């Protein structure tokens, strides 16, 4: 059951809701539009707010669901491992030639299971940053940093380590966005 749990966690993470929503309902492969990223922000920019919200919610839920798999399947695998595999699946999707999204929403779903109050803190930072700057990328990075700071204060060492790993990954995956922010060429959300 443990191997099945691990495989399913990765495969669930690999499901690209941005690709599915784009192809099924809009007849568009969003990899060919906008940033080409298989995430909620590109879905929003290419397909509209409704699609962006649906993709964001679905990506969050898949992160949470992956963490629930050990409970559902009576597995001894730690939910953190399942969450990490879902995040890796989102970034390196087997269903999309190992090219996925930046996993911000999927990581949010994982932390919704592990640290709901930490996610609330991150969400507040995300919304405030987005309201003031209109940069989704900056909002995502600052929300991740806020979650890490929350974890340092209130969570155990494993959650602290995971939140550090996630924020470092998010920043690395957003390095082109950081360059564009510094150059003043990053797209703002309208």
Curated annotation (Swiss-Prot):
GO molecular function: acyl-phosphate glycerol-3-phosphate acyltransferase activity
UniProt membrane topology term: Multi-pass membrane protein
Chief location bin: membrane
InterPro entries for the chain: G3P_acylTferase_PlsY
Pathway: Lipid metabolism; phospholipid metabolism
Keyword Hydrolase: no
Entry's Gene Ontology cellular component terms: plasma membrane
Catalytic activity: an acyl phosphate + sn-glycerol 3-phosphate = a 1-acyl-sn-glycero-3-phosphate + phosphate
Taxonomy, superkingdom: Bacteria
EC number per UniProt: 2.3.1.275
UniProt record, GO biological process: phospholipid biosynthetic process
Uppermost EC category: transferase
Transmembrane segments: 1-21, 53-73, 76-96, 110-130, 152-172
Keywords attached to this entry: Cell membrane, Lipid biosynthesis, Lipid metabolism, Membrane, Phospholipid biosynthesis, Phospholipid metabolism, Transferase, Transmembrane, Transmembrane helix
Subcellular location: Cell membrane
Family membership noted in the UniProt record: Belongs to the PlsY family.
NCBIfam families: glycerol-3-phosphate 1-O-acyltransferase PlsY (TIGR00023)
Role: Catalyzes the transfer of an acyl group from acyl-phosphate (acyl-PO(4)) to glycerol-3-phosphate (G3P) to form lysophosphatidic acid (LPA). This enzyme utilizes acyl-phosphate as fatty acyl donor, but not acyl-CoA or acyl-ACP.
Assembly behavior: Probably interacts with PlsX.
Protein name from the UniProt record: Glycerol-3-phosphate acyltransferase 2
Species in which this protein is naturally found: Bacillus anthracis
Gene this chain is encoded by: plsY2
